Amino acid sequence: QPAYAYSGLCRDTNDIGNTYVEIDLTNQRMVFYKDGQLLVDTPVVTGCVRKGHATPTGCFALDAMRSPAVLKGPGYASPVTYWMPFSGGVGIHDASWRSQYGGQIYITNGSHGCVNTPKDQAAIIYNNISVGVPIVVYE
């Protein structure tokens, strides 16, 4: 019998359940489903590939939620309204300093690894998600 480090939301053909976030790094899009209903489908800007800040891939769980927050790192302190970390210091948040999302922005002008999201879309996610919800990040 295997020992599981984590338990799925259920043990059948859909073990992440019907509420989850998908982040598609190649297409720079994020979708959020709640109870099987699509609530958000938005362009995003993820980690800057050229600077070595690629957003980590894998299956994660939402670690926490904070509103507002100040994101701090070497040489920056960025206030955000919605902060939803899922992999250490990497998370989903609004980015008031951006006017465009999607496309190839992430290659040369991406984030430090986080998923920069339009504020209105980040608000929808924040107001409908809870800690522990699966976050699936893939290329």
Give residue ranges: language-model regions.
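Cell wall/extracellular polymer interaction/catalysis modules
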Residues: Q1-C59, A64
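Exported/periplasmic cell-wall-interacting domains
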Residues: P2-I16, A54-T57, R66-E139
